[in-house]
Amino acid sequence: MKWNDSGFDQGAFEMKQLRIEMKGDINDWLSYRYRQRLNRGNDGSGNIDNVPTSIDWAGVGIRLNKFSFFAGKQCVSYGGIEFDLNPIDIYEYSDMIEHMSNFMTGLNVAYNYNSYQQIQFQVLNSLNGPSEEMYGDLERTKLPLVYTLNWNGNFLDVFKTRWSASVMNETKGEKMYYYALGNEFNFSPKWHAYFDWMYSREGVDRKGIITNIVGTDNQAHNAFNAEYMSYVLHVNYRFAPKWNLFAKGMYETASVYKASDEVEKGKYRTAWGYAGGIEFYPMESNLHFFLAYVGRSYKYTDRAKALGEDNFSTIVCQWDSFGRCLYSSSCFPFLFVMKNRQATCCLPAIYHEMSFFYQN
């Protein structure tokens, strides 16, 4: 149920996520994975890889001793703990992740130094659809690819890392550089936390946040020289075997790092996000009920206000349940810390939400 400044807006049941997934091992060296969103369109005829965006995963994996390979549609191996979590476990994403294109087609190569240290190198398409849909009338690059180097570390199950560095060909002569440092902490069986830092420097604004602020009425392309930075801290306290308290904070900035097209250099927006709530797990991992309070606050600088922007805040209260298959869903194709691998057919992950929404 949603309210806005005018009062009651809408009351309806809604499935945020509805996916079907199959993955498993054919033998000790060959595996497969397929996942599709059932509540997204299935037309991939105009896409660069000829695959609809409803398909997140469609590929084959090969394991050869310490090396692993995965070819096909897959998730970009960006760093960050939250980026790798199952989407149905996230009540509110940061703007950085919310505006990303996460599933593209290509090749991933992983080297497992041991059971606790892994390096990945990945080359994927940087686009799903045509370049014009993402960037406008700018001349397209002939190699629309994104290259990512990723380190996944595990230190005594107390401190874990998901760090990455990426470079992406956007349009001719323009690139995006993206860095993510994900840090997970298991202080005790009851206390768990993660802290993510993300930075994106984009020759052409791929996220679209700066473009929406500065406007492109006299341009047929996205803004140039956008810069985004995000900090995310999430803490869990499992105060009882079936009960969990959580709190989350986010701080993000959107800036222009070099003036161009009459767009002034400097910061345009600061965003704060916060969430807190309680979760109840009647079973070990298959289902949980929740009550969550989520707030966002957006503050614009004077240069953004001169372009017509104004500060605003949103509040959403959510309550209901998550259901998913027992086999957890990870963004990374190589779950190298798992000892037992077996063929699994996952039931659809369903997220149905009742909300109270307020915007000021």
Report the location of each language-model feature:
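Secreted/luminal cysteine- and crosslink-motif detector
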Residues: 332, 346-347, 352, 359
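Solvent-exposed loop/turn segments connecting transmembrane beta-strands
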Residues: 12, 40, 45-50, 99-104, ...
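A short secondary-structure junction signal
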Residues: 83, 120-122, 130-135, 162-164, ...
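Solenoidal tandem-repeat scaffolds enriched in leucines and small polar residues
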Residues: 128-130, 136-140, 151-154, 158-161
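Outer-membrane beta-barrel pore domains
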Residues: 4-8, 47-48, 157-340, 354
